[in-house]
């Protein structure tokens, strides 16, 4: 599932910006393992109390992840939903959208849930929503077998996130 939007589904194809974002996230994750989570999170996570002292955190938080699964699922979403959008919009517009979603997520967090934030989840939600809006009926095959409409993963993830938020899990 990646780039062609024909009725026959998507071909697996990674695009330039998506590949570079994935590399940057993986490198940052291994750097966190090497240097230490405390140091990396202290200096590069978004921290509402440090916004004036470490303003770069509004961008760098998107490249830090809380664990292997956090990284894996964010990169999985980027891999599947990023290339069709980059193909449609072009590299510059895709990158602008990606960072605007990340900045939007950190702004919402700052105003409504001021806590330390790491991960590219806000950008991933934006990509899934943009995909669902552009190709709502394109079939996506779960585990390569079960077809669902393109909008369904976005809807399911939003419902899951809302439930987790009410349970206090995020």
Q: Can you say where each PLM-predicted feature lies in the sequence?
A:
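A detector for small-residue-rich transmembrane helices and their helix-helix packing motifs
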Residues: 1-170
């Amino acid at each position: 599932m990646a780039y062609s939007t024909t009725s026959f589904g998507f071909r697996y194809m990674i695009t330039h910006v998506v590949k570079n974002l994935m590399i940057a996230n993986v490198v940052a994750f291994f750097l966190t393992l090497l240097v230490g989570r405390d140091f990396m999170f202290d200096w590069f996570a978004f921290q509402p109390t440090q916004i004036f002292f470490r303003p770069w955190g509004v961008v760098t938080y998107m490249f830090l992840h809380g664990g292997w699964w956090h990284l894996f699922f964010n990169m999985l979403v980027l891999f599947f939903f990023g290339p069709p959008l980059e193909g449609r919009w072009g590299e510059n517009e895709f990158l602008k959208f990606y960072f605007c979603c990340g900045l939007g997520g950190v702004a919402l967090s700052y105003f409504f849930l001021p806590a330390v934030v790491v991960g590219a989840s806000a950008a991933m939600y934006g990509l899934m929503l943009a995909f669902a809006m552009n190709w709502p009926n394109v079939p996506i095959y779960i585990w390569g077998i079960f077809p669902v409409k393109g909008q369904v993963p976005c809807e399911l993830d939003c419902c899951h996130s809302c439930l987790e938020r009410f349970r206090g899990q995020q």
